């Protein structure tokens, strides 16, 4: 619980502007891990230099962060929230678990730079994301999705 609380201390800034933070997160994900862009077919035709200003990228990033905010606020009691996300990402979108680890790293970097998440907060975020991703991986296995 302490890890969730530590991350939530900085979450208000993110929550106040999901679109901007979402754009920063996805643009950085696509820059640092270009292979992840292929997992988002709707962004395939967008030039790399135009990703940051694209409304669709921003909107999807906002959705990602909004869902993450819900998971954080559940403070570990996230099974009912996570199950449908796991299901859609395993069965419909076919997103390998490693990609959640990559975006978690990027979220941490963006929160450090833009929302004041300090070293202890970074550790807390890594701990929280490890729990969420492990639970998601268990859901994936239950659904028979292996990468």
Swiss-Prot record:
UniProt keyword list: Cytoplasm, Heme, Iron, Metal-binding, Muscle protein, Oxidoreductase, Oxygen transport, Transport
Gene3D superfamilies recorded: 6.10.140.2100, 6.10.140.2110
InterPro entries noted in UniProt: Globin, Globin-like_sf, Myoglobin
Enzyme Commission (EC) number: 1.7.-.-, 1.11.1.-
Catalytic activities: Fe(III)-heme b-[protein] + nitric oxide + H2O = Fe(II)-heme b-[protein] + nitrite + 2 H(+); H2O2 + AH2 = A + 2 H2O
Subcellular location: Cytoplasm, Sarcoplasm
Pfam families: Globin
Role description: Monomeric heme protein which primary function is to store oxygen and facilitate its diffusion within muscle tissues. Reversibly binds oxygen through a pentacoordinated heme iron and enables its timely and efficient release as needed during periods of heightened demand. Depending on the oxidative conditions of tissues and cells, and in addition to its ability to bind oxygen, it also has a nitrite reductase activity whereby it regulates the production of bioactive nitric oxide.
Subunit structure: Monomeric.
Protein name: Myoglobin
């Amino acid at each position: 619980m302490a890890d969730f609380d530590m991350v939530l201390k900085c979450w208000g800034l993110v929550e106040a502007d999901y679109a901007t933070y979402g754009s920063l997160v996805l643009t950085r994900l696509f820059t640092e891990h270009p292979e992840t862009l292929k997992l988002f077919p709707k962004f395939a035709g967008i030039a790399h230099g135009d990703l940051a200003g694209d409304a669709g990228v921003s909107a999807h990033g906002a959705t990602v962060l909004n869902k993450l905010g819900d998971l954080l606020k559940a403070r570990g009691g996230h099974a009912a929230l996570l199950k449908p996300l796991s299901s859609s990402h395993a069965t419909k979108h076919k997103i390998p678990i490693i990609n959640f680890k990559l975006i978690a790293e990027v979220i941490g970097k963006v929160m450090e730079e833009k929302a004041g998440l300090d070293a202890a907060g970074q550790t807390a975020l890594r701990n929280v994301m490890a729990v969420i991703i492990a639970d998601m991986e268990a859901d994936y296995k239950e659904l028979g999705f292996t990468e």
